[in-house]
């Protein structure tokens, strides 16, 4: 099921890897300078350029170490013998957007990766044979997005893949041969199934089907058909779902919020239906889980309130996790475990610390060898990165808003997380909105803080992870109470001396871009300026143009937002659309958009830009012809952020690195408003556009 409507464009723009820890660059603690001029300017290239290495993994047999790294400036997959990193070689040859998402199959010397074209999110699945370095498209069909359903060590030569080439709304299920690329039909999806669960033998066991009321039917396999055995009410649709199946098929894991507020992880006996609680946290929903690679049994469960904490439920790895926890005060994540579970790849990071990759060879009692391999972004080692401070704010109606504050180095001399003096602030709003902000390294937080701004990220109502009541409190509240929470957070920051009322900008991607537009139209006196990245301006056209394969989620979506197919719904969505209040805009606005965005179409940005232009309201519009829902190519990401940096400096008074050569290799265009950002028009005159899909 598609849990996120509008994944954060900021996150997409940063993603060069598959785990958050992979994105964490380096930092060091030094004496705080008295003024911003005393803080070293961190180059945008170090923050937003390609990582040196990311998404580090071991093959299941432990034979190879792999990672993502640049090849001629474009991210590709590299492989080395596990014991000889100097023998690394690139095994993919992408020259456009780069490879970010990859994983190992159980077929010897074969890995898999996903790639779309120009940000259209029609992801194809490719197999790479390391003996020949040849890539094969396993899903070679137009307008098709692949969904990987199963990869099993019991059937190493094949994978289960959903493909929507027959019907763009629904994925049929195929078994695909990794050597030949041939596919054989497992199930033609005539039941409008949104999610399949198969066991280790690729036998279909469970599925979900959307209900007209926005809830879900839970189905189980009976013979060659399906029967409904339970349901998920609409209210639990965001917080309840399947969470895995043990390899013997005897235990089904579910995250379940039915009959409670926060969801918990349960183990269900597939033969008897007996349900056993594995882990719960009264403050938050359960998060990720670690499972034994041999059995599939859950061994540890995460919960993230202010920071992520792991609860061990299998003593077999208790000593190992304690060993990793002792690396430092940051957070350790396990990227991969070999099939025999003897070797782990670990990424350690903190908000202001580098990602450090470790190899951990287990001895069974936590005393194995833990060896550091390398840093993901060594260019940031020794740079003045700053901490992130978790906060618990109060909304006007008494809700707790878990938030995160980042202060510029010169504004927090004693490092206590409290501002010594007010500084300009950027309210950085996450996407989704069914997502959350969390502790950890953020290149945007570090960039903005280094330029002299405090950064506040708020988990407003509607965010996920804090129980279904908090998530459901956002229903029908786009541009309503969800926005009130953001305003309350700004008022908190002013009252705490973090900033002043006249020096607050709002910025965000996707839903965060929408929140930016709402900020400048619904509350036009609150913010000094706004930066909108792929944010929708017209909720009616947004919901009328979602990708066809969102069909399994659409009923829930419109119930939470409004139905564009009813007159009442249209009126409601129009009322909550920034486009209807363009006349109210009186502060500077910068908009960034990808021309191929399948979620928030280019027309969303075009509509508000055209409306503003017709009313002679200034706006700067940056458009990338080879991007989608966010800016994946580092050249484009750096180009947009160079523009945003100059825009914010003019608005808030922070410092800005000149645009310089930052447009090199990018596809940037500025259809209107280049004169609104210092140096932008001049930089465009000398720029030669490079479009890569």
Feature map (PLM): residue ranges:
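Non-catalytic accessory segments flanking enzyme active sites
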Residues: 54-57, 89, 100, 123, ...
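Multi-bladed beta-propeller domains
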Residues: 19-53, 80-100, 129-146, 176-194, ...
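A flexible loop/linker signature enriched in serine peptidases of the S9 family
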Residues: 50, 68-76, 94-99, 106, ...
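Beta-strand-rich domains and repeat architectures in extracellular enzymes and scaffolds
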Residues: 41-78, 344-345
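C-terminal motif of bacterial Sec signal peptides marking the signal peptidase cleavage site
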Residues: 14-16
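Cap/lid segment of the alpha/beta-hydrolase catalytic domain
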Residues: 376-502, 509-510, 515, 537, ...
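Hydrophobic beta-strand positions that form the internal "hydrophobic ladder"
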Residues: 62-65, 111-112, 159, 205, ...
């Amino acid at each position: 099921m598609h849990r996120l409507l509008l994944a954060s464009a900021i996150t997409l723009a940063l993603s060069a890897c598959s785990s958050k820890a992979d994105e964490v660059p380096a930092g060091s603690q030094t004496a705080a300078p008295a003024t911003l001029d005393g803080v070293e300017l961190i180059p945008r290239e170090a923050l937003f350029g390609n990582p040196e290495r990311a998404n580090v993994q071991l093959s299941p047999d432990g034979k190879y170490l792999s990672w993502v790294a640049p090849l001629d400036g474009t991210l590709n997959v590299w492989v080395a013998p596990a014991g000889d990193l100097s023998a690394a070689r690139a095994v993919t040859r992408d020259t456009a957007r780069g490879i970010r998402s990859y994983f190992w199959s159980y077929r010897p010397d074969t890995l898999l990766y996903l790639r779309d074209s120009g940000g259209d999110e029609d992801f194809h699945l490719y197999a790479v044979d390391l003996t020949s370095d040849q890539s094969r498209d396993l899903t070679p069909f137009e307008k098709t997005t692949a969904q990987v359903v199963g990869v099993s060590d019991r059937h190493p030569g094949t994978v289960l893949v959903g493909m929507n080439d027959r019907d763009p709304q629904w994925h049929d299920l195929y078994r695909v041969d990794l050597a030949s690329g041939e596919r054989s039909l497992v199930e033609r999806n005539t039941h409008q199934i949104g999610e399949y669960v198969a066991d280790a033998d690729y036998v279909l066991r469970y599925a979900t089907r959307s209900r007209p009321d926005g809830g879900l039917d839970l189905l189980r396999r009976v013979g060659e058909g399906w029967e409904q055995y339970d349901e998920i009410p609409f209210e639990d649709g965001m917080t309840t779902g399947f969470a895995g199946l043990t390899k013997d098929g005897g235990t089904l894991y579910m995250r379940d919020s039915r009959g409670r507020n926060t969801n918990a992880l349960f183990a269900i006996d597939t033969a008897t239906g007996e349900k056993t609680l594995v882990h719960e946290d009264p403050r938050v929903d359960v998060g990720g889980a670690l499972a034994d690679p041999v059995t599939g049994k859950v061994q540890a469960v995460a919960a993230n309130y202010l920071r992520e904490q792991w609860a061990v439920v299998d003593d077999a790895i208790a000593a190992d996790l304690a060993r990793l926890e002792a690396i430092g005060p940051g957070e350790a994540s396990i990227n991969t475990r070999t099939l025999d579970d003897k070797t782990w790849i670990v990424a350690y990071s903190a908000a202001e610390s580098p990602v450090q990759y470790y190899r951990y060879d287990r001895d069974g009692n936590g005393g194995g060898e833990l060896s550091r391999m390398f840093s993901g972004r060594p260019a940031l080692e020794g740079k003045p990165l700053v901490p992130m401070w978790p906060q618990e704010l109060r909304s006007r109606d008494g809700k707790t808003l878990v938030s995160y504050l980042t202060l510029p180095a010169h504004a927090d001399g004693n490092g206590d997380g409290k501002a010594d003096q007010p500084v300009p602030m950027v309210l950085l709003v996450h996407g989704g909105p069914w997502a959350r902000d969390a502790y950890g390294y953020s290149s945007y937080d570090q960039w903005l803080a280094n330029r002299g701004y405090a950064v506040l990220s708020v988990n407003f109502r509607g965010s996920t992870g804090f129980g279904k009541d908090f998530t459901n409190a956002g229903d029908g509240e786009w541009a309503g109470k969800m926005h009130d929470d953001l305003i309350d957070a700004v008022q908190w920051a002013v009252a705490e001396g973090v900033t002043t009322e006249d020096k607050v900008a709002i910025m965000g991607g996707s839903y965060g871009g929408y929140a930016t537009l709402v900020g400048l139209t619904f509350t036009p006196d609150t913010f000094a300026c706004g930066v909108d990245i792929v944010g929708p301006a017209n909720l009616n056209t947004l919901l009328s143009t979602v990708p066809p394969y969102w069909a399994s989620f659409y009923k829930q979506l419109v119930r939470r937002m409004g139905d564009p197919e009813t007159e009442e719904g249209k009126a409601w969505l129009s009322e909550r659309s920034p486009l209807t209040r363009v006349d109210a805009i009186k502060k500077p606005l910068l908009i960034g958009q990808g021309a191929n965005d399948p979620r928030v179409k280019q027309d969303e940005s075009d509509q508000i830009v055209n409306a503003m232009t017709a009313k002679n309201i200034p706006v700067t519009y940056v458009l990338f012809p080879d991007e989608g829902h966010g800016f994946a190519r580092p050249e484009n990401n750096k180009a947009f952020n160079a523009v945003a940096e100059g825009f914010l400096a003019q608005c808030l008074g922070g410092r800005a690195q000149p645009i310089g050569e930052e447009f090199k290799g990018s596809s940037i265009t500025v259809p209107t408003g280049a004169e609104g950002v210092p140096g932008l028009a001049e930089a465009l005159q000398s720029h030669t556009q490079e479009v890569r899909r």
